[in-house]
Amino acid sequence: VGFPNCLDPAILGDILAGGADKVKEAGAVLVGGHSVQDDEPKYGLCVSGFVHPDKIFKNYGCRPGDILILTKQIGSGIVNTAIKAEMASPSAIREAQTVMASLNKIGKQVVEKYDVSACTDITGFGLLGHCVEMASASDVTFELSVHDIAYLQDAYDYAKMGLVPAGAYKNKRYSINQVAVGSVEETYLDLLYDPQTSGGLLISVSPKEYENMMRDFRASGLDTTVSVIGTVAPKSDKLIRLF
């Protein structure tokens, strides 16, 4: 953790307590750390552990016909940019904070009950960046419906106003040549390339498993955040097709 002398130490206490709470919720143990004086507050954790080889989720192996499911709304980077500009509404801030503070633990518990083709978490490369990665590794094409994807409250409006983090433009430059945009509005591209903090799980699952998985998501309380965003198709000239 890095922390400046000019801030109240009670803030540091809250940061450490919040981190410890999430570590405990995840079922892990916090075993130590280092602290330094810094001009800006910084906090982060690294994870060390073991996983059974049969329980590893791969980010490749998607099969044509699979259904693509996303467990959280996207747009956290854009909402955070609006917060920095002091233009975010209180309700948008609350929703973004709730989503970012939510672990993927419940989603993982649902996913591990099924024989999914592939699964990854959406982070700094944005939804499209991770879709490109997964589709490329699987040698398939993803067909995504931009209007079926769940977005955070007001994220579209903030993106329309230009409140887009620099990372979104870097993500776009990296993989836009692999995306068939069609007539999709530029604002939606900003949302799809928006770097996510604590993003959800992107899951590729067979149609046979899809309905039962969605039933379990609803029963687990994720019905307000999970969305079916598209399907997997045989590989074409582009890795991603937007509709």
Predicted regions and their residues:
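Helix-biased detector of long, well-ordered alpha-helical tracts
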Residues: V1-F243
